[in-house]
């Protein structure tokens, strides 16, 4: 009989996604058929499913932890921010429109139908559904029509365990305060709590755990010590980049990644961040691109035209041209590839108001935004060295021009992708996930004069998931969590 458990948090980035992934691996190893589920996610870091849909990257990692293929039903509502007040709305893998934050509230009753439909589909094919909430149930101003936290928990009668992050401080106030602001019927859905990311001697917080339990009446399910290897797993939230780009090692080649306001699919760079032979720095607003950079990467973007305007406002276009005069390399990924061309046109207003503007002019190609979004897994080889790759496309827009006659990649179905400049210093591609391929990554490192030190990226992810599952089994009452799960 299928059971379900919902993991909510006192706020964003308290570790909900990773805890669900670790529990998914732990319970899968016990022989259970586990399915991850997040009713509503907000992220521009998405993954492509086998049926050509898209879901949040965190749910794809959780599916991997559960050793099942990602499904659009694991994240039935995905919001992809395009501005400070609006987002694309993806339902069961397909974009259905764009909504402003205020207008989105009116969509929720209809979206709840899709959420419950997807949940039932997963329930029918599993022993345990691990549900992840979004943000915090303490955001009571958003409670009416909620589909992400208590609205879902109440609709399905799914028990909730809430997570607090002690590493950021104030965990007692966060947990006790969450209960204090909630309606009694919502608060009653929370059966226990987890304190995450503890550093030091856990016995020193025993009184804190007891105090939280006494004040709330919740069962303590464990104090999870900080897990340093979590940084080796692909991040979903761009907030992780604020930490990721902090350090530079002047003794190895430097890869500078432009930190666009609407950066998307930035996990493309995660395998490079783990390579000891290079240093990866995300360049924030207001800072010049380091002159010592060996490679500049223009990453994916949810709003390419706006982020191109932003790039110019930072003076990065000037830095890029100076970089090329020094004989260094530039790589554009997806939206970054579009920026490298002569022009970008959006006549249908796919990204906002219809407009067109000049590109950087570093590749002899032009892009026209199109209504149809391409979502597909791809395989093939690079034209330069015939090295194999696998990855995925996730973009709107067609890019054509003379430099496209000199593509970077050739797909297995014969199609070409990307473009390379005549001098070979500038390249662009629509393919995401290129650097997760060990031989592709090694080839790019060789071009920078660096030796690969990470021999098998994918095997490394698997090993970290197993070690994190071990970590949770050692520090959480996993048997108690299973007993809490109600049969559906």
UniProtKB/Swiss-Prot annotation:
Biochemical pathway: Cofactor biosynthesis; adenosylcobalamin biosynthesis
Its protein name is Cobyric acid synthase
Q: Which GO terms describe its molecular function?
A: ABC-type vitamin B12 transporter activity; catalytic activity
In terms of HAMAP family, this protein maps to: CobQ
Q: Which residues cross the membrane?
A: none
Q: Which UniProt keywords apply?
A: Cobalamin biosynthesis, Glutamine amidotransferase
Q: What is the lineage of its organism?
A: Bacteria, Pseudomonadati, Pseudomonadota, Alphaproteobacteria, Hyphomicrobiales
Family (UniProt): Belongs to the CobB/CobQ family. CobQ subfamily.
List the active-site residues.
Answer: 334 (nucleophile), 432
Q: CDD domains this protein is in?
A: GATase1_CobQ
All copies of the GATase cobBQ-type domain together span: 252-440
